[in-house]
Amino acid sequence: FETIDDLRSIGPTLRALFAVDPYRRIVDLRGGTQEVMVGYSDSNKDGGITTSQWEIHKALRAIRDISDETGIPIRVFHGRGGTIGRGGGPTHASILSQPNGVLDGEVKFTEQGEVIADKYGHPDIARRNLYLAFTALLEASLAHRSPSHDEETITRWYSIMDDMADDAYASYRRFVETPGLVDYFTTSTPVEE
């Protein structure tokens, strides 16, 4: 699920899949856990960083709820890039930012080639990054199982975030659809190099 529309359809898509008995049997035969990938890079290119991050957050909540409803464990594979615009950034912060109840002792994410040397090129730095990822996973799995705020506060916050994401999406799409922007971008940057 990589584009904004894909992320928005994650709930209906998973519900439809899990309603098909042969598909459920396949999940059972493969260990009983469904893996679902959420894409950071394409959703960011499609909708801008604010909308992308918010739609990913909502998709993760939908995944959690569907897993709870169906009893099928869902492992989320985070398709993150190296830069902030592609979902990159500190791994531990990304893990801790997951909605409550999403992580259950496991997480899967990509580390792009451009950050491998930075994060794992020296044994001490590699140990530190793995330590931070592991402790974040433990904290998110054990301490973030239930909401940290009351339902009214969460509902109000989600409403504000929906409005912000909608406004950000409209602004971003107006910008990237500006006539001549692609020509200007390709002639004024080294994108073709």
Protein language model features and the residues they cover:
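Conserved phosphate/anionic-ligand binding catalytic regions in large, soluble enzymes, centered on
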Residues: 1-5, 74-92
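Structural preference for beta-strand elements that scaffold enzyme active sites
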Residues: 33-37, 73-75
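Well-ordered, non-membrane alpha-helical segments in soluble/globular domains
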Residues: 13-20, 53-62
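Acidic, His- and aromatic-enriched active-site or binding-groove loops in soluble protein domains
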Residues: 17-28, 95-113
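Acidic, glycine-enriched catalytic cores built around paired aspartates
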Residues: 39-42, 50-60, 80, 91, ...
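Non-transmembrane, aqueous-exposed alpha-helical and coiled segments at domain scale
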Residues: 58, 62-69, 93
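Short acidic, glycine/serine/threonine-rich loops at helix termini
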Residues: 7-13, 46-51, 85-92, 119-121
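Carboxylate/His-rich catalytic cores and anion/metal-binding grooves
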Residues: 1-25
